[in-house]
């Protein structure tokens, strides 16, 4: 730490000098600047700083390093700044990069050399007369390496209010513990009183927990039970696992409990089979101070009993645990110091924390509650989160205004709009206005241009719909706005760093000073909801008063809104309590601008004649604001309670299907289009109207086209009804006519039922539980693994191009499955497909009209309706019980048994033994599903052989001959990009052996580390892999994405969902490197963060179950909604934290999935135009099936469900 802090000032001075020069400077000029004596105090660099630069390798090595490439560009002995817009290099950003640079240098030197360097630096610093000139002004003037100095002077007051230890039972004990800080100035190998106190403090918590456990039990307890209890119940309280670490450090519970220091507390009995412990006096209360003193004696005796090396290890370990607890588990001393007026000065963090503590005790509305939830992040210097929360609402207001205005609007117009909306009456007005002024409104509007956001077609939305889209978190536009501003803030976060404290203090000041009634009355989210809900009913009332009657009673108004003949359609509106809200507002004469209420009668205001939708929206919004400003607390509370009962998720699905007698007003705004339904007059969006027309056309044309097929199937069904059912048979040979007719009976009955449903509602042939099943004999063979279930689908798809002969079919099957199935099995499958009418009975076998209809792409039918597939992928439908239940036992059902895993290990061992015949050392490594832990019962074994001395590919033929002597079904594939040898081992385990290709090992490790972050990730990866394998779309040599590619798609999806489950493990790959040699791409950086422990708690924000995540995966990639992935515009890259547009080299590729390590490699480049269509069909099919509430996993994997 001292080394890095000494480098700060030279680097910052060099940065300021280069910025002042405004041009490139030579390395010679830079060396003169740093090492020449300077009279100017601002540029004066002390001897310790110069020594640090020299020991760090010199300026050339420092400035050309990867760690400082964000600030300096070094080329041909010239130095220039990367970003000239920066005024300086902030210490919080620069210091970690210097630490990383020094760690890289340290790895290149021996421990003795590095200790000598540190000793020289420390000695030189101590000789310095004024230590303050060694460091920048915002870095503590201390030579200590304590972890607390990672936080700088701006937060010193906050650190002083932190308490290292928590409350205890005795004042004396508090005094003792307050002196337990680690003094880093002392020798690390010295046993000091502070370190003994720290070890005793760490031991105190687990010992107290052990006492509690023993008091509950009436007899002595086995130590094994105690360890298990501590691990399961996590009884380590405030210090996490630090106490248990110290227990292990001192030899475990046995050594500790055997000590004489704790003899007055515990009685320990050791037998041959058990090690039991009990309390000496279970009823007596043990004083915490006495226990702490005993533990101090114990720790002191342990230290003194150790040798030099063991003592040094124990002291270092306890010191690290103490530092970790100091930085992570300390509590703030919350005071009640009032916050001061913050204009240009930063308010102390102590005061902000006090206000934060106060406001958390109140009740607030949803939008403000989101900001309260983020306050803790603001205090951790999350300026990007603060700016996103403050800038989101201005962007929402600007977008709504632009769409309702229907014209180009000037920047001045939006500036004036923001001044009016976010005035002093707004609860966060001061904070938002200060943020806009600090950053610059023009800069925000230029960077966050409305054109950056996908345009919403105004013709396809009703008047109030834009409010729902912008302000309801369930709608797509809200998330788009949030992502847009989040992306811009993250890119420019360094520019706002100085203004962070001021903005933070203003926000806390606004929230803490606002009263409850003020917040309820002026909260924007509630007002937008009320406006959006009330506009359409108010239009209905105004039209009725203009065209039919001049007045209406309040009861008549409510009847008009609900509709007399449309009770079923509008029952959901009644559930939303809209009538209660409207009647309440009318009774209090809120809308007197255009509606007058007097003695139970509602009339039009004669002075109001502008009833355009935009003007009506403005008036409703203004009326609500005026009412809420001037109303009493009781009235506000009543409105708030009504507003809270409005279910916005239900409202957003209604799409304003209200019965409106006069639609002239709505035709003026071109917001909706009128269409007549057979049951009632409803208004639906134009996009829905187009889907309805396509649906009707499909129903008429397709049913007429296949009418003859339906008649033939009905006759077959009538004949089958007279025949007998299946007779049970133990052999696997289909009997003659009875089995044939009954098989056709069962399948045809289901198929006709599907046609009937198709005829009535015009949807796909998959309707709930109506599905085609194989005959009982085929089903039985599938269950016994005589042949795979997807063999039926494989043969069915091959009939698209036609199967010329039976021998050709055998060749197809062997090429794909690498196994020769008996002729009888293949003939049974052909006969079954022939009997249900899917393929022809003569060679060449081709699809019939029925089979072609079954494989037809659903988008050509227009059947993907919003009624079947919700726009919200994560809609928590309670009917997904059957799917969730089928997924619970999924992993156990497909996981390989111990026999298969043992056989795989035996194959590796046998292969390694056989390859010893080659010259030189040969190593074998596994990759793929065996390494990632995603194996199933049918998974292959992927192996690679390599040598550290030479390439093994020249020994290809010799290795092939060795394998032929040991294994069966050997198939060499020499012409592939990566030559492999396929063979089969024990228990029919298929193996692939490659040469010198080490990159897949790191690919597999990356998948493994992602799966360790959350238990749902592994399950979802196995589900998608298993689904792709069953649907025959997981083999690259058949022009489909590989299993590895599907895993990458799953990981990218879990990174992009609204509440991400997975982080980016390659985020810091530009600072670290792990080079692996690849034959085609040269040196490849395969570094990623393998420490996944830190992500397990922070990333698990949303607890969506597997069923919803699986459905969301297929909807994300398979549909073409606003929420879905745009294959034409973007590409998948899990090493990037944000969506990336297709580069020019991939613009002609339909799918682009980048390799995490090879940035120029598209994992889906082998896909053809036909295979892309098949993949999209399969994704859409899965989404359709999972959209049915009664679906389960069998439906998803069944080859005969469309």
UniProtKB/Swiss-Prot annotation:
Q: Which GO terms describe its molecular function?
A: RNA uridylyltransferase activity
Q: Where is the PAP-associated domain?
A: 1105-1159
GO cellular-component terms in the record? Answer: cytoplasm; mitochondrion
The record, for SUPFAM superfamilies, names: Nucleotidyltransferase, PAP/OAS1 substrate-binding domain
GO biological process assignments: mitochondrial RNA catabolic process; nuclear-transcribed mRNA poly(A) tail shortening; polyuridylation-dependent mRNA catabolic process; RNA 3'-end processing; siRNA catabolic process
- The highest taxon in the source lineage is Eukaryota
Which Gene3D superfamilies is this protein grouped with?
1.10.1410.10, Beta Polymerase, domain 2
Please name the PANTHER family in this protein's record: CAFFEINE-INDUCED PROTEIN 16, POLY A POLYMERASE CID PAP -RELATED
Q: What is this protein called?
A: Caffeine-induced protein 16
Q: Upper lineage ranks?
A: Eukaryota, Fungi, Dikarya, Ascomycota, Taphrinomycotina
